[in-house]
Amino acid sequence: IRALKKEKTLGLSFAGTKDNIVGMAVAAGTKGYYFPVINFITKDLLTGFADELAASCKTMYVPDAKQFLHYMTDHKPQGVDAFYHQSLRDVSIGAYLLDPLTGSYPIEKIAGTYASKELPSYQDLFGKTVLEMASMQPSFDAYVCHQAAAALFCGPVIEKQLEEEDMSALYK
């Protein structure tokens, strides 16, 4: 955990439903770390950790800032701090700015477009299994880590293309 706080750029992905977090993945460099909600690792501990990481890194790429901010608002009911606006980058918003006619921007599609990586979707891996049950399967941690890694690797590519299109001010 201390090592992650020293990273300048991170990818982070929460796994959860609207009201529940089952885990969180953080990507740094070529490594991914998955933290499940289990035993002493609680939702509050994970959101607190995400809060610390957002404060300590220069840039944090996430697949879905709306989900991230929803969980963080639950963690900080008094309001989300302004530093999120400095460090947080939503790759789905960046992908939308570059190609607004696509319609939907799941991280699997973004990874294929901006990193030439094929990621399986939740449906591909777990079918109609509810999230809480899927999170107990051995492949779930890799699934969430791949989402965080995709955000980390696609983020700079998207930012570069936005700069080339003179749209980076819209993204940041």
Give names to the regions the model predicted:
Residues Y33-Y34, Y96, Y114, Y122, ...:
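Aromatic side chains
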Residues D81, P120-K172:
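Mixed-charge, glycine-rich, non-catalytic linkers/tails in nucleic-acid processing enzymes
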Residues I1-T113:
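Conserved RNase H-like, two-metal-ion catalytic cores of nucleic-acid enzymes
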